[in-house]
Regions:
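Serine-dependent carboxylesterase/thioesterase catalytic core
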Residues: 51-63, 67, 73-87, 91-187, ...
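C-terminal catalytic-base region of ester-bond hydrolases, centering on the histidine
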Residues: 192-246
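Amphipathic, positively biased hydrophobic alpha-helical segments used for protein targeting
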Residues: 68, 132-133, 154, 212, ...
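Residue-level signal for well-ordered alpha-helical segments
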Residues: 42-45, 49, 56, 75-79, ...
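Sparse, context-dependent recognition of short Cys/His-centered cofactor- or disulfide-binding micro-motifs
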Residues: 9, 18, 43, 124, ...
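Contiguous hydrophobic segments
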Residues: 13-37, 117-133, 145, 196-206
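Flexible, membrane-associating and regulatory peripheral segments of lipid-active enzymes
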Residues: 1-53, 60-71, 75-82, 105-108, ...
Length: 246
């Protein structure tokens, strides 16, 4: 947990600081996944109809869960994909939506439920678990930037800045109170009662793996792309191991 943070990124460095071409492996990762026994549920703990909340990544929306969600359903889980669209709204606004979704899901389940978040969705899911530890039975984050609000890569930082500015203009003034609250819970103490697994990859083409390190989490290193953290054999194996703890 003493790994230094990546160097601050200017525009040019932010563009080239991560080898984004690694993400070209994603298609092959998908083919490998569909040919692997885990894709049909082999070795995966059966969900037995239990509910599970899924939070998609930044700008990707449902696409980032296009393999994870049907796989969990095939394994017997009743998936509840969070209604956050492409997940481009300010973090506090997204978490407010997640809080309503979590309340509905736990009411349906009759108790706490596991939450899985990819990329920015994992960061938001951490905030959700901090605020509602009694409603979350397990938190699994996949390539989540726990140590910064947004990764320094220009592919992420540029649209994030533009969308944040647009959101502030629409609201006439920034929600600074909400932003401060979100930031405090993003990096603040995590409830010891909630199992927390942070999965990351050194081969991530967008996010420096060190940004996924959280002092409260069990860290699981795998080898895949950033998008493959929700669509690859090693990612699904890591998720299956985490679900076995329930």
């Amino acid at each position: 947990m003493n790994e230094p943070l990546p160097r601050p990124a200017g525009a040019l460095w932010g563009l080239v600081s991560r080898p984004s071409w690694r993400e070209l492996r994603l298609r092959q990762e998908g083919r490998d996944l569909e040919a692997h026994p885990i894709w049909t549920g082999t070795g995966v703990p059966p969900g037995q109809g239990r509910h599970i909340v899924l939070v998609p990544g930044f700008l990707a929306g449902a696409r980032s869960l296009s393999m994870l969600e049907p796989w969990l359903q095939r394994c017997g889980w009743d998936t509840r994909r969070a209604p956050v669209g492409r997940n481009h709204q300010p973090g506090e606004h997204v978490v407010e939506l997640l809080e309503e979704w979590l309340a509905e899901t736990t009411a349906m389940e009759g108790g706490p439920v596991p939450v899985i978040g990819h990329s920015r969705g994992g960061q938001e899911a951490r905030v959700l678990a901090v605020r509602h530890p009694d409603a979350v039975s397990l938190l699994v984050t996949l390539g989540a930037p726990h140590r910064v609000l947004y990764p320094p890569h220009l592919v992420v930082r540029a649209p994030a800045a533009a969308l944040q500015l647009a959101a502030w203009i629409r609201r006439s003034r920034p929600d600074l109170t909400g932003h401060r609250r979100y930031e405090a819970d993003r990096v603040g103490p995590f409830p010891s009662s909630v199992p927390f697994v942070s999965v990351y990859s050194h081969s991530d083409g967008f996010l420096d793996w060190r940004l996924s390190l959280d002092p409260a989490a069990e860290h699981v290193e795998i080898d895949c792309t950033h998008l493959g953290l929700a669509a690859s054999v090693p990612a699904f194996e890591a998720i299956a191991r985490a679900l076995k703890s329930l």
